[in-house]
């Protein structure tokens, strides 16, 4: 009878151990001989990629620090440099622009990173120097150049702390040419940082906030900024120098994700002869990418249930052992049983948590 009760208690512990805790994700250099797909927590990317929608014929201008021209995963249609007199020196020596280009359009070539829109056409405008410094004048030149190239989307993973009339005019000009401008809502530099970032804060720009790996808003400060859509920005795989990849976190990368995703929606709409506007595009992006931002993360519920069930199991085991102790002749077996059971509880929880961690990475 005692053994039967013990089995029932252990079954309860196993059930409790099947729930999860919040995993921890660390940034690192990634090297792989196989293709690496981008984060797709909501399954939104798969619905396009599985139907061979990869951004074909969609032109995306990237205004950043240039591009690594030797990276095997990256290709571009045109490129130009606005940071010096040599317009042909668009080589990225900073790394930021290469990462943005990789997230948006890394090619599907059987190895390395696959971008959000791997068949899109990239137009590179180097508007930030090798130290990452950027001025209004260079961004304005980049915007005007992108308009001349008749691109469909302009990605600006850069930000200014204030607006500029000439910058706004360049943005307005791009919008008037039916170009979708996607820009960062601004990094969170400290707790309580809710300052608006430009050009993302302009009304006609799609301003992007950041989601964590679970599809939740990364920081509450984003709720106080001008954000039109949230996109994944934690632990995104990026292209880097020497054909390496990195895991990176930041709203810059969320912006790139959003630009690539916009290209997928565009291709899908064009294939069905549907019209494209900023509002209709934004509506689809929000429906696809922001499914879970108002809900409670799954690990909150499962972690709570795990704690409650484990607590109840331990209390039940303790009561059972006390009652058995009083009835026992030797008064040793119940204590030994309780000790073994507690050890099993700890072991089961540790194993299940580790398995969930591996699955959740």
Task: State the predicted function of each range.
Residues 74, 210-252:
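Catalytic-core environment of secreted peptidases
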Residues 152-156, 165-166, 177, 204-207, ...:
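C-terminal subdomain of the subtilisin-like protease fold in secreted/lumenal serine endopeptidases
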Residues 4-24, 318-320, 348:
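Sec-dependent N-terminal signal peptides of Gram-positive bacterial secreted proteins and lipoproteins
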Residues 336-356:
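Final/C-terminal transmembrane alpha-helix of multipass membrane proteins
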Residues 101-104, 125-128, 233-298:
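Hydrolase catalytic cores
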Residues 19-29, 354-359:
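Sec-dependent signal peptide cleavage junction
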Residues 127-202, 243-255, 298, 303:
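Substrate-binding/access-modulating region of protease and related hydrolase catalytic domains
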Residues 28-121, 141, 214:
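Active-site core segment of subtilase-fold serine proteases
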């Amino acid at each position: 009878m005692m053994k039967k009760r013990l089995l029932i208690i252990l079954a309860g512990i196993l059930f409790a151990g099947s729930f999860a805790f919040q995993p921890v994700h660390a940034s690192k250099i990634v090297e792989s001989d196989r293709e690496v797909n981008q984060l797709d927590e909501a399954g939104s990317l798969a619905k396009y990629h599985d139907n061979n929608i990869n951004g074909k014929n969609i032109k995306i201008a990237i205004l950043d620090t240039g591009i690594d021209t030797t990276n095997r995963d990256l290709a571009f249609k045109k490129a130009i440099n606005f940071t010096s007199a040599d317009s042909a020196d668009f080589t990225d020596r900073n790394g930021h622009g290469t990462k943005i280009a990789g997230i948006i359009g890394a090619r599907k070539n059987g190895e390395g990173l696959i971008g959000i829109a791997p068949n899109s056409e990239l137009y590179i405008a180097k508007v930030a120097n090798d130290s990452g410094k950027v001025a209004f004048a260079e961004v304005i030149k980049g915007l005007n150049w992108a308009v001349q190239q008749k691109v469909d989307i302009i990605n600006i993973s850069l930000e200014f702390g204030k607006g500029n009339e000439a910058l706004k005019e360049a943005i307005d000009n791009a919008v008037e040419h039916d170009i979708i401008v996607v820009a960062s809502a601004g990094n969170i530099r400290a707790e309580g940082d809710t300052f608006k970032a430009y050009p993302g804060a302009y009304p006609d720009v799609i301003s992007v906030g950041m989601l964590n790996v679970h599809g939740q808003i990364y920081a509450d400060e984003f709720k106080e900024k001008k954000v039109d859509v949230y996109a994944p920005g934690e632990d995104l795989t990026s292209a880097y120098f020497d054909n390496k990849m990195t895991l990176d976190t930041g709203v810059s990368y969320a912006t790139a994700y959003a630009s690539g995703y916009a290209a997928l929606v565009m291709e899908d709409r064009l294939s069905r002869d549907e019209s494209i506007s900023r509002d209709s595009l934004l509506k689809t992006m929000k429906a696809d990418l922001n499914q879970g931002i108002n809900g409670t993360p799954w690990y909150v519920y499962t972690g709570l249930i795990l704690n409650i069930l484990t607590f109840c199991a331990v209390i039940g085991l303790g009561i059972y052992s006390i009652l058995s102790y009083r009835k026992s002749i030797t008064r040793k077996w119940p204590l030994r049983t309780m000790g073994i059971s507690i050890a099993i509880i700890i072991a089961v929880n540790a194993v299940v948590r580790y398995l969930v961690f591996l699955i959740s990475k």
